[in-house]
């Protein structure tokens, strides 16, 4: 007890003695009161000691707890912390441990926060992939017993894997969205409605939510894109079919190009493939309806136009046949066409296709006949010149000095040269015709007559004419010989001299019947031999420039 406290207690005791003296308190009472004071002081001391003892125990417990917590934190954090434990009082020991504990607690809070954020992100991405709604309260709880850096690294690696998967899925979703958008423009349907049918988070009105990347969303997208591509393919095939129908009908009815240009967008699709990039709206239902309406309109005009085209093609076929001297019964063919069209038994397209086939065959046959027909034309021309020369040589005034006489003389000279080539022409024609008939197994008809038979007939007729000419020349020779003998025997009689070049026996000349000539007949003939009889005609003495054959 300090001196000041002792002095205070003594003075108080002295004051108490004085009071007791004044009161007249007995010594027994005084002793009793003093004992009570001592007891009360002792109780107070005891209380103080007990309180101090408890405080010491509390400090010891705090120190032990701090040390235990440090050990637990080091285990949870996976870190080892070295610190020097002081040998001093409990308070000094606690003050040395407290900073270490606080540092570890800060690390724990930081690590727990990092783990919690990582786990929440993992839970969020996992929920997105699973297609579940995510809230922060549904995140995973942090395991307080494992707050190590290794655990954090593992979770972060898992998070990165999930982020990569999310990025891949998001890329797929964006790719699907682009595909749906492209198809929506081609097919002209509501893009937002299509996306909303997959998931509401995909529309532009759901900007507050991330796009769904769940398996269900990807599966729905796959089915949607597949169905849209199938629809695109179906519409493309339909429009291509309508386009081909329009092309056929336009060509059939010779529709002007101005009318066709309205449907260039359909015609441009004829060579397109299902995977090709197409123009916006080119496969819309409105485009298909317009094409269907046009095909219906063209089909309604087709019947009347087809009749006109059928007869036009028939005329073309007949013209080809006539121009190439091929056999065709025009009247019977037209009558048959009229009956077939009016009865309705035959499809006009089939009829037209049949006629087109006949035209193609006729053109092919005409091409194969061209060389022969060209030679037939030359042969006919020679025959015509032969006929003209016959008529010319019968004209007694052909040598008169009239206008154009010199032209006729030149023509006659050329005609004799051309006529001399007729036998060779007939030989070549016969060879060509036989080769043609052997190759095709059918007779070569020219104006409905077998050309080979016509050529053979011409050979016979020409031989007959040559024989008649020979007999005529022999008769003339005998007549001339008889006249010479008479003149030698009886002398010449004065007679009026006939004009130069005039035949002495004009009235006795045997003429070839024109009716037996074939220059104007449908057929043509070839003679394999024989000379031209023109050289045996009576020629005036002064016509020395003209060709003569004996």
Curated annotation (Swiss-Prot):
Principal cellular location given in the protein's record: nucleus
Keyword Nucleus listed: yes
GO CC annotations, alphabetized: cell cortex; microtubule; nucleus; phragmoplast; plasmodesma; spindle
Swiss-Prot/TrEMBL induction comment: Expressed throughout the cell cycle.
Example GO molecular function: microtubule binding
Gene Ontology terms describing biological process: cell division; microtubule cytoskeleton organization
Region annotation Disordered: where it falls in the sequence: 471-531
Database matches in Pfam families: MAP65_ASE1
Entry keywords, A to Z: Cell cycle, Cell division, Cell junction, Coiled coil, Cytoplasm, Cytoskeleton, Microtubule, Mitosis, Nucleus
Keyword Nucleotide-binding: no
Localization per Swiss-Prot or TrEMBL: Nucleus; Cytoplasm; Cytoplasm, Cytoskeleton, Spindle; Cytoplasm, Cytoskeleton, Phragmoplast
Coiled coil: 46-174, 288-310
Record field: compositional bias (Polar residues): 502-511
Positions marked as site (Microtubule binding): 401, 412
PANTHER family: 65-KDA MICROTUBULE-ASSOCIATED PROTEIN 5, PROTEIN REGULATOR OF CYTOKINESIS 1 PRC1-RELATED
Subunit structure and binding partners: Forms a dimer. Binds to MT, mostly with coaligned MT, both between parallel or antiparallel, forming thick bundles. Bundles polymerized MT via the formation of 25-nm crossbridges with cortical MT.
Role noted for this protein: Microtubule-associated protein that bundle and stabilize adjacent microtubules (MT) of the cell cortex. Confers MT resistance to the drug oryzalin. Promotes the formation of a planar network of antiparallel microtubules.
Family to which this protein belongs: Belongs to the MAP65/ASE1 family.
Annotated protein name in UniProt: 65-kDa microtubule-associated protein 5
